[in-house]
């Protein structure tokens, strides 16, 4: 909780808020005591890798926003809906799957959009991002987009130009989409500057 408080205090003047990654059983510390401590410190957004981890967080915190980084899984859609988990959509296929889930249930469900700006791990690649930007209203019609996110690949290297390049790409995509809130920085990125 001390790290969360340090980062939250650092970004508070900008109006930004922080979330916490609690993957892998709270990084081996036990997800339930970790999320309780973070909740007490003011954290409301929790990031996990898989829906099972999200369910564990939801069982402990009924009012938290629980984001599942690895995207929706077709055979677990009911788990996302029932437990109010927010999938991170990492590809056009993820967007189509979540769009279908929303239409089937005649409801708008929350989701985050992840754009790969250089991490090369998760997120829409450049081609998919261009497709999304050119047809966002149709592709995201039934989706309640909460966050548009990316992840800094070299934030721990203050001399790397990659973070500035990623920030520029991310801002451009976010501005064109015009929906949701921005989420870019990992812990190290917060200390690179106010942008």
Question: Predicted regions span which residues?
Answer:
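Active-site loop/helix belt of alpha/beta enzymes
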Residues: 24-37, 41, 83, 95-110, ...
């Amino acid at each position: 909780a001390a790290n969360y408080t340090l980062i939250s205090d650092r970004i508070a003047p900008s109006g930004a808020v922080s979330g916490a990654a609690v993957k892998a059983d709270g990084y081996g510390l036990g997800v339930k005591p970790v999320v309780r401590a973070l909740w007490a410190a003011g954290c409301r957004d929790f990031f996990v890798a898989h829906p099972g981890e999200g369910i564990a967080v939801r069982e402990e915190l009924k009012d938290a926003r629980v984001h599942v980084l690895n995207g929706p899984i077709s055979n677990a859609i009911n788990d996302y809906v029932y437990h109010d988990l927010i999938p991170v959509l990492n590809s056009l296929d993820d967007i189509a799957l979540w769009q279908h889930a929303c239409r089937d249930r005649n409801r708008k469900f929350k989701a985050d959009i992840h754009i790969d700006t250089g991490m090369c791990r998760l997120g829409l690649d450049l081609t998919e991002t261009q497709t999304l930007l050119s047809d966002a209203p149709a592709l995201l019609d039934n989706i309640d987009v909460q966050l548009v996110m990316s992840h800094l690949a070299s934030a721990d290297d203050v001399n790397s130009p990659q973070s500035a390049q990623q920030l520029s790409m991310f801002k451009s995509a976010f501005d064109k989409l015009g929906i949701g809130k921005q989420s870019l920085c990992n812990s190290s990125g917060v200390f690179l500057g106010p942008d």
